[in-house]
Amino acid sequence: MSAMTPREIVHELNKHIVGQEEAKRAVAIALRNRWRRMQLDSSLRDEITPKNILMIGPTGVGKTEIARRLAKLADAPFLKVEATKFTEVGYVGRDVESIIRDLADMAVKMLREQEMKRHEHRALDAAEDRILDALLPPPRDFNEDSQRTNADSSTRQLFRKKLREGELDDKEIEIDLRSSGAGVEIMAPPGMEEMTSQLQSMFSNLSSDKRKTRKMKVADAMKRVKDEEAAKLVNEEEIKQKAIQAVEQNGIVFIDEIDKVAKRSENTSSDVSREGVQRDLLPLIEGSTVSTKYGSIRTDHILFIASGAFHLSKPSDLIPELQGRLPIRVELQALTPDDFKRILTEPDASLVQQYEALMGTEGVKLTFADDAIARIAEVAYKVNETTENIGARRLHTVLERLLESLSYDAGDQVTDTFEVTADYVDEKLGELSEDEDLSRYIL
């Protein structure tokens, strides 16, 4: 679990997301409260439930990006799902309990990787010995003492040095490896993914103990053998127990597109698939027990963050019980021309840096003048205002259109340097941005 302070979390989010300070503060506080709760006595800890968050804002302003970046910072089981993927229990499709099952799978995978990394040095030593045994097999008539002498011989040490320096990477060896199984693929009806995964697990376990001699290069064999040796050092039962605890105490679920399952105000009929999903989410968010292949998981202390654009519906169109379980409301603001300018240049791996790097692979040094950045931002903002507002995603469309001819000609190395100026932006995009009919279809 991450022990970062709210200020540190916001600072990390600022590297990738422009503006939306209120939303960043809300998720930073929620993440820090997870850590604070774990410092308390167990009696008080059980009484403190997470304050779930509802993020409201137009598309393309950073709701999903906040979730993506938060997943990397959390150092806890984190799952992002779309509310539209689920259907009411009893109907064809995935039921909401599969969210917790997927979260448990994520936790097991995360903890297994951490454990394998912890045992990396021991696994590497064991892998080196197996590779050296394949390179320098001991004579058959050697007894145990002779083998021990051979292990410490100068020849073996010389080969070990060469192996570590990569001089033997291209040499082919024959080595005994665990069989990867037949790769049984089972197609199941929607809503029966749990049964499918259990059947696949059963078939893979049947062949997991079989071993097969393979011929491969030392570099490839080292990776396979190292993973095999690390897996031997990992206690799977302990990982499963830790995973259940991690999900129950620190799990975070981000539910995107929650507005798509809200019943619209003008539609008075009871829509089964929409309202049913909301009602199924209630016990999950409030606290219930879900059965998974690792054991039962209680959802009382899992943090839920929901988000939606709410273009065609309002937060009040969600059923009242669900509204009550999302007590913290955060409104994300629509982007301004200044925000667009900052998005183009400020974040790590910004759009401008990406295009400069892509053109650099063709030997073209691409630069953007300050007035060009401002003009691109104005065009994106104007098109958003006159057509559909798709937020920062409009910049991708505008930049692709702007640099289309340069991208096409760059392979022929027409020029070594190219500066995008405001005049060039006007030449390529001026007519399109002015003509609403054209921009509606092209930008």
From Swiss-Prot:
Single Gene Ontology MF annotation: peptidase activity
Chain spans, region Disordered: 136-158
Binding-site residues for ATP, renumbered to this chain: 18, 60-65, 256, 321, 393
Gene3D superfamilies: 1.10.8.60, P-loop containing nucleotide triphosphate hydrolases (3.40.50.300)
Gene Ontology CC terms, in alphabetical order: HslUV protease complex
Subunit structure: A double ring-shaped homohexamer of HslV is capped on each side by a ring-shaped HslU homohexamer. The assembly of the HslU/HslV complex is dependent on binding of ATP.
Assigned protein family: Belongs to the ClpX chaperone family. HslU subfamily.
Protein name, entry field: ATP-dependent protease ATPase subunit HslU
